[in-house]
Amino acid sequence: MKVVRGYNPYRGKVEIPATVNGFPVTEVDGLAMYACYYLKELVIGDNVKICGHEAFGASINLCNVTLPVADVEFTHNWMFNCDRGIREIHCRSSISYVVDEGIFNGAVDYDKCILYVPVGTKQSYANSEVWKNFTHIVEENVSTNISNINVEKKSVWHTLQGVKLFAKPNIPGVYIHNGKKIIVR
């Protein structure tokens, strides 16, 4: 699956999910979020592998970007062409991303924007093309685990013949409820 250009502009904080209905989101189309003037914060999901030409270009209020843990192709010029408004970039990959020199097209003030990288990777980023231009490279702890999962145990009812019921039965009989035999009177 991929994120494509929509007619309703994205606003505020946008999180591109890793999956939608169990399918991985692997690509952000060129111009997908182009000129989204009200987009302020962007989090790119961990399954995204490709971001197209000017995917987030001309989003003049974009100030905070979080890049995925996985390796992603950022080889298109002007991908973050955002009028020098980006103030923070959070890189979650322990290996510095390979990016095209024109990725920001002058949209990042390297002296003001803070580049956050995983603990222990500051030197690697400082030695990498494009990333070495940042004056402020700060290490931060990066969580790569799944957190805040709410599991709601649903009540499951079946007849003795194995037919699944959508609710607790109101007709007397013997049923299976969450794997146990239950008598309903």
Write out the residue ranges for each language-model feature.
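A structural signal for leucine-rich repeat
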Residues: M79-C82, G102-V108, S128-E129
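C-terminal tail/sorting-segment detector
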Residues: V174-R185
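Consensus positions within tandem repeat domains that build extended binding/scaffold surfaces
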Residues: D29-A32, G52-G57, H76-M79, I103
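Residue-level detector of functionally pivotal "anchor" positions at catalytic/ligand-binding pockets or at interdomain
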Residues: V138-Q161
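A recurrent domain-boundary module in secreted/ectodomain proteins
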Residues: N127-S143
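Structural signature of tandem-repeat unit edges
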Residues: P9-E27, C36-I50, S59-F74, D83-V98, ...
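GGW-centered surface loops in extracellular recognition modules
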Residues: M1-P9
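Short, small/polar residue-rich loop motifs at catalytic or cofactor-binding pockets
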Residues: N21-G22, N150-K153, K168-N170
